[in-house]
């Protein structure tokens, strides 16, 4: 057992939260990171035990086009500020992981600048993939190179070059010795070289006990990445999609099927989330805002490691607009939310869930056993050492009765509501309120959690919320009460996110709009895929497969067809599964997805 096995994560995008300018002119440091120190106390207050913060290091724009891996972004402050920040987190019992952007660098990175200056004579010409001095690009460099996602601002590192591997491993050692970081989230892990990741894992094992490596992976068999030689965990995008769509469609079968499929991959501790810096806020994604409560009960109790993205505990909105992620990464002042645990039902619920999670080991280590499943009701058990904890959720607008098998005890207590129910003939009979969830623990469990008694609601950016509500009873019901009248359909704009080829001078500005780093990552995006990644619009269902071709040599439609064929070999492929494949238009991601089938 390691600290990350029972962690509750809080995710901060620091450049956004601290209100940093979108473009970095490499001026004198501005100590914005220090303004985030009060957020550490907030994390602790809502039951968090770990912080994923990033990106942090010097870059020209959104942070994912690194200029210097060993220097805090000057828009945030100095290395001394970062050392002090991590130390303060540790004093408060909060572990810290950084964003490791090791798939690519920015164009201002020293190795790339040397290639620009010395061309064929550069000692770093093999640090990047497919540098071709007969080619050119929109920056008029006089050479071309591989990039991430079609954006030449993000220059792909040659992860098979031993010098690159050594350099990045030394970066990890530096981060530990200089900042005492506890782990790393690997950006774009689904396109990282596997031998490279194994080298990172060996370094992780060397630098610090229980040093955690978690990778950003969108699709595929997660066990290919999560194992004893590669990573400890990956992002659970599969569950992310199921959690909001399973509620929007009143279809708990989707969530249950997703959990079963993930369970079949092995005993993986995946990084669970409902939103992050790349995808729209859960409050925005939910058609019925009252589903905020059951969604988060599931997030905190299903197998895996839960994470909350900063601000979402307040119920704020965030929608992708015009291909930009700016609204997903806002500047917030913690003083505006200082009483939120008492006054905001959403925050009160998140705080209660965090404390229950930390108090009940079965939620971190217990086995998973499905107890009841309908479109609108779902219940399961987490069993550990003879103790059964039961989770029940209801996405219907009416209360629902549930008859659930129990463990060896005489009564259960609702950890969120405080309600007591007696065991009769090995079962409990409960009435789950509308649009709510509960965690049933054996009577006598030491929770140190009181039922939430929020008094009023004051949530930013949620115009549909009644901000003058008197809340008085069960926490999950209170999170429902504030929004029960708002069931309007989600109206996500399907904007064309195709980025025009940037000019040599203007491409540096903010990198811009963060679309260059993240547009492709939102696997559930409603936008129609465009020709940024592939100019071939062929329907994959019409492709005649040539299985003699390697995945790397296949076109995007061929890869899509191959993935669909592999999925079909495992069982029926429904419309949503096909959409997920067709929406993925990124060659490297599809190659890795296809390779993940065994």
List PLM regions with ranges.
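Substrate-binding cleft of secreted/luminal carbohydrate-active enzymes
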Residues: 304-317
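Active-site clefts of carbohydrate-active enzymes
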Residues: 266-287
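Substrate-binding/active-site clefts of carbohydrate-active enzymes
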Residues: 1-9, 13-49, 56-178, 200-206, ...
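Active-site-proximal helices and loops of the catalytic beta/alpha 8
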Residues: 86, 90-92, 116, 177, ...
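Basic helix-extension-helix modules of the SAP/HeH family
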Residues: 540-598
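Conserved, mostly hydrophobic/aromatic
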Residues: 12, 43, 53, 69, ...
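Carbohydrate-interacting/catalytic domains
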Residues: 1-52, 58, 88, 314, ...
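Structural preference for beta-strand elements that scaffold enzyme active sites
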Residues: 7-11, 50, 95-97, 183-185, ...
């Amino acid at each position: 057992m390691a600290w990350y096995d029972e962690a509750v994560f809080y995710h901060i995008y620091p450049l956004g939260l601290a209100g940093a300018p979108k473009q970095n002119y490499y001026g004198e440091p501005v100590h914005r990171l220090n303004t985030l120190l009060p957020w550490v106390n907030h994390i602790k207050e809502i039951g968090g035990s770990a912080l994923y913060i990033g990106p942090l290091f010097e870059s020209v724009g959104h942070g994912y086009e690194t200029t210097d891996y060993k220097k805090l972004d000057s828009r945030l402050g100095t290395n001394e500020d970062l050392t002090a920040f991590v130390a303060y987190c540790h004093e408060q019992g909060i572990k810290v992981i950084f964003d490791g952007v090791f798939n690519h660098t920015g164009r201002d990175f020293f190795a790339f600048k040397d290639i620009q200056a010395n061309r064929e004579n550069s000692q770093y010409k093999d640090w990047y993939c497919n540098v071709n001095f007969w080619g050119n690009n929109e920056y008029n460099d006089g050479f071309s190179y591989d990039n991430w996602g079609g954006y030449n601002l993000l220059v792909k590192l040659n992860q098979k070059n031993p010098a690159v591997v050594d350099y990045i491993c030394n970066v990890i050692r530096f981060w530990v010795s200089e900042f005492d970081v506890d782990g790393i989230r690997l950006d774009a892990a689904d396109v990282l070289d596997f031998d490279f990741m194994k080298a990172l894992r060996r370094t992780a094992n060397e630098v610090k006990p229980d040093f955690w490596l978690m990778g950003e992976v969108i699709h595929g068999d997660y066990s290919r990445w999560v194992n004893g030689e590669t990573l400890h965990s990956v992002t659970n995008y599969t569950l992310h999609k199921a959690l909001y769509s399973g509620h929007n469609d009143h279809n708990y079968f989707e969530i249950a099927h997703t959990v079963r499929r993930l369970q079949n991959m092995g005993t993986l501790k995946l990084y669970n989330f409902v939103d992050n810096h790349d995808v729209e806020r859960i409050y925005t994604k939910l058609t019925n805002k009252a589903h905020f409560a059951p969604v988060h009960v599931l997030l905190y109790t299903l197998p895996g490691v839960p994470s909350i993205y900063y601000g979402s505990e307040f119920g704020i909105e965030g929608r992708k607009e015009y291909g930009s992620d700016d609204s997903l990464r806002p500047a917030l002042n913690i003083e505006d939310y200082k009483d939120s645990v008492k006054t905001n039902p959403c925050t009160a619920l998140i705080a209660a869930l965090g404390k229950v999670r930390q108090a009940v080991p079965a939620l971190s280590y217990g086995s998973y056993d499905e107890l009841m499943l309908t479109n609108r009701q779902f219940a399961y058990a987490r069993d550990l050492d003879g103790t059964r904890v039961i989770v029940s959720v209801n996405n219907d607008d009416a209360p629902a009765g549930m008859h659930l098998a129990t463990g060896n005890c005489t009564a259960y207590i609702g950890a969120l509501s405080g309600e007591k129910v007696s065991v009769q003939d090995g079962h409990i009979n409960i009435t789950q309120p509308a649009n709510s969830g509960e965690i049933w623990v054996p009577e006598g469990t030491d929770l140190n959690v009181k039922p939430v008694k929020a008094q009023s609601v004051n949530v930013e950016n949620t115009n549909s919320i009644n901000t003058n509500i008197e809340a008085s009873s069960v926490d999950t019901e209170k999170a429902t009460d504030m929004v029960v009248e708002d069931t309007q359909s989600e109206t996500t704009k399907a904007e064309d996110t195709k980025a025009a080829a940037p000019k040599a001078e203007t491409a540096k500005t903010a990198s811009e709009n963060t679309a260059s780093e993240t547009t492709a990552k939102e696997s559930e995006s409603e936008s129609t895929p465009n020709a940024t990644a592939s100019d071939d619009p062929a329907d994959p269902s019409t492709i005649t497969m040539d299985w003699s071709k390697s995945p790397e040599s296949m076109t995007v439609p061929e890869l899509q067809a191959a993935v669909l064929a592999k999925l079909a070999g495992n069982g029926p492929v429904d419309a949503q599964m096909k959409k997920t494949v067709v929406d993925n238009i990124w060659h490297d991601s599809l190659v890795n997805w296809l390779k993940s089938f065994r």
